[in-house]
């Protein structure tokens, strides 16, 4: 079974790498269209271009998740920690999700204490990826014209980074299962690979931290990442 798992991991990694190149080329071509380098587009062409870009971005995101998963499974997760301000991670996540939030009229609110927050010694790319993924989920699971909250607070020797939505919430029966690979809450209509939360948990735990959820049906969900300051 170990040989089979190893072959599967290698196959997924190879395919993911092969997919990234043509997807990136598609996105570059679409950028040329958006910049009107080949002439102005009519309304129908603009809508088609946006649709293609959204799907290409989603596909690129999935390949990224697969590559992250194979690194974890192969024990090849490389950490490059550096001193990082929590607010920088929050700002990165917001920037990455602002277009999607605007599309659905979702207001992103920031909660950040006025007192000086301690810095983190983390792999900023990986923790930013986690926060971006959590905020993306919050936006996608929110009602149109709703709001989501992203923030940070100090808890003794820890810093908590959190994302909260006010959507339908998660049944308590699935509070642990949502962190399993490929798990999808039964009945959910939001598209996804079922890998994001699993990889996020792996990244956080690789830093010696925890990723937990607080959720109640009909009241939304709050994902909390706790890291040593």
Annotated model-derived regions:
Residues 54-59:
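Short alpha-helical segment of the dimerization/phosphotransfer core of two-component systems
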Residues 70-81:
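Helix-loop junction within the histidine kinase core
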Residues 46, 80-85, 102, 107-118:
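Conserved catalytic submotifs in the C-terminal HATPase_c
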Residues 1-38:
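Primarily the dimerization/phosphotransfer
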Residues 86, 169-177:
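Short helix N-cap motif at coil->helix boundaries in the Bergerat
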């Amino acid at each position: 079974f170990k040989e089979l798992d190893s072959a599967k991991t290698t196959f997924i990694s190879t395919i993911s790498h092969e997919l990234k190149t043509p997807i990136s080329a598609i996105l570059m071509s679409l950028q040329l269209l958006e910049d009107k380098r080949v002439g102005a587009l009519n309304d129908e062409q603009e809508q088609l271009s946006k649709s293609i870009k959204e799907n290409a971005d989603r596909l690129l995101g999935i390949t990224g998740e697969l590559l992250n998963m194979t690194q974890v499974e192969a024990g090849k997760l490389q950490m490059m920690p550096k001193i990082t301000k929590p607010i920088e991670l929050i700002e990165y996540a917001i920037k990455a999700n602002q277009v999607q939030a605007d599309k659905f009229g979702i207001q992103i609110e920031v909660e950040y204490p006025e007192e000086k927050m301690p810095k983190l010694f983390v792999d900023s790319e990986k923790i930013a990826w986690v926060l971006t993924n959590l905020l993306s989920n919050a936006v996608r699971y929110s009602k149109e014209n709703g709001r989501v909250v992203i923030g940070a607070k100090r808890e003794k020797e820890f810093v908590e980074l959190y994302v909260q939505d006010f959507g339908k919430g998660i049944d308590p029966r699935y509070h642990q299962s949502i962190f399993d690979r490929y798990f999808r809450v039964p009945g959910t209509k939001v598209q996804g690979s079922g890998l994001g939360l699993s990889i996020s948990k792996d990244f956080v735990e690789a830093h010696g931290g925890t990723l937990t959820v607080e959720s109640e049906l009909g009241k939304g969900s709050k994902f909390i990442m706790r890291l040593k300051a």
